[in-house]
Amino acid sequence: MTWDDHKKNFARLARDGGYTIAQYAAEFNLNPNTARRYLRAFKEDTRTTDSRKPNKPVRKPLKSMIIDHSNDQHAGDHIAAEIAEKQRVNAVVSAAVENAKRQNKRINDRSDDHDVITRAHRTLRDRLERDTLDDDGERFEF
């Protein structure tokens, strides 16, 4: 059921049975505040002699009223500056993290190279030691 249907039902029930918006909302399991917002418009059908709409403000703001936007812009500038500062800080932090990752990768690459070289050196040395084992003056080769 749409709000237009609810408006029609409520207008009919309010005229016939004196229903309130709260009662109507409770009966149809609607949020009372939302129902109040949408169902007040039914009063347009039952206009008073001055034909004022219920949602219309009682007093219109003066056209001659001076609107000062400088304060709003000033506050907006602060917010924009804070956002820009956060972005700058985030950029610096992310750049530092990327730098650290790059350095760690270089260090790991170097240590991997060192391990490979050391392992190769160790295996050569072990092979040489194995090849030159002497047992009673005889040389054993594997």
Curated annotation (Swiss-Prot):
Region (Disordered): 42-76
Ranges of Basic and acidic residues composition bias in the record: 42-53
Domain of life: Viruses
Protein's UniProt name: PAC cutting enzyme
Organism of origin: Escherichia phage P1 (Bacteriophage P1)
